[in-house]
Amino acid sequence: LDRPVLAIIGLVLVVATILFLRNDREHEWRWYQAQFKQQVGEKFGADLARTVPSGMQQIWVPSLGRADRCTTCHQATNWKGFEAADNPWKTHPPEILRTHPPETYGCTSCHGGQGFAVDMEPAHGPVHFWEEPVLGKAMGEAYSIVDNKAALMQMSCNVCHRYDRETKGADFINHAKKLAQDKGCRACHVINGRGGTIGPDLTYVGDKAAEQYEYGRLSGQKTSFAWHVAH
């Protein structure tokens, strides 16, 4: 290659590097971390504020194949004293963490969302080609079904507690199981290995990949969650 071409290539690489570094410094999580460190300093003093980690944080759970970076912004998860704070600086309810520590379960296995992402919109998952958005009030409002955050989050409980007749603290799932029993759904459908064969097996219908559903009759969003809402 002659010198002009090499010069152009070099200039392009320099500009690309500058843009990359600039974009990296503009991530939202840097501001959230600075705000949390400031709040810790105001509440507990400068010495404790200096112990707040900086940079990207990640919880890696090999058994679940999950790498969650949620605590990059939600740094107060295990801190006492921020129970009344706004998200993402709010303490997580401790009674749940005692039986579901993040080191074992991660974050997205219960909450949903895109664990790899570190900016709010992609992390919370209301983006194209991501089928597991955060299960919360915003999602309920988007689908016009319910504005109770717990009602949606408890869907994740059934992944592990599928065979429990009742799950402590999961009132919505318990009610749904009782409703299926009272309405006699097993007369036509197999659920957890028992039931009729007139209709399809419903045991793992919620675990199917998004492309396995038929969306022809859906008028709104073409997602697996929308399919379940419609049915």
Residues covered by each model-derived region:
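Extracytoplasmic electron-transfer domains, predominantly the class I c-type cytochrome c fold
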Residues: P93-V159, D164-A170, N174, K178, ...
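N-terminal export/targeting leaders of redox proteins
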Residues: L1-R98, E141-V146
